[in-house]
C-alpha cells in the first residue's frame, strides 16, 4: 500500500511479494500501476494469442499524479497499436479488474466452461453478481469507487466465449 494514503499506507501483503524481492529490485519510485483488459491464451511457450478486439491497457501513478512518464508510456503503447490511457485513480481501476476476475475465474474454473457458457446459467449468473457486489462493498470500504455496477460488469463479459487464464492453466496442468 505504498503511496496509498490513509491508515493503509505502507502496509505489506507478503504473499504477493515474499521477502519484498520485487519491491527492492524495482523500487516504489519506479513503479507504475497497470491494468490489462484482453482475452488471451498461450498458443505455445513464448507465444500469446489475443482474441479480443477491444483490448486495452490502463496505466497510472500510485498516488494519482498525472506524470510525464505515464503519459509518455501510454503514447508509446498507442503508437504500437494498443489502446492505452492514463487513469487518475489506478487503484480503483485495479479493483474494477479484480471484480471481473472474482466473477469469472472461480465459476469458470468450477464449471470448466468459458465465461459465456457459465453465465448463461441463471444460478451461476446470480452467483457472479453476488461476487461482484461483495467486491464492490470491499472496494468501497477501502475507499475505492468502481465506475460500474455489478450488473454492468457482468453484462460486459457475459457474451464472451473466453476461458479465464485460471481455467486455461488448470486445463494445461499448471
Where are these predicted regions, by residue range?
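Helical "substrate-binding/catalytic lid" subdomain
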Residues: 83-174
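Short beta-strand and adjoining strand-loop segment in the mid-core
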Residues: 3-12, 20, 46-74, 125
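ATP/pyrophosphate-binding catalytic subdomain of soluble kinases
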Residues: 62-66, 70, 75-82, 86-92
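Short Gly/charged-rich anion-binding patches and loops
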Residues: 17, 72, 134
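A generic secondary-structure signal marking the coil-to-beta-strand transition
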Residues: 29-30, 55, 73, 82, ...
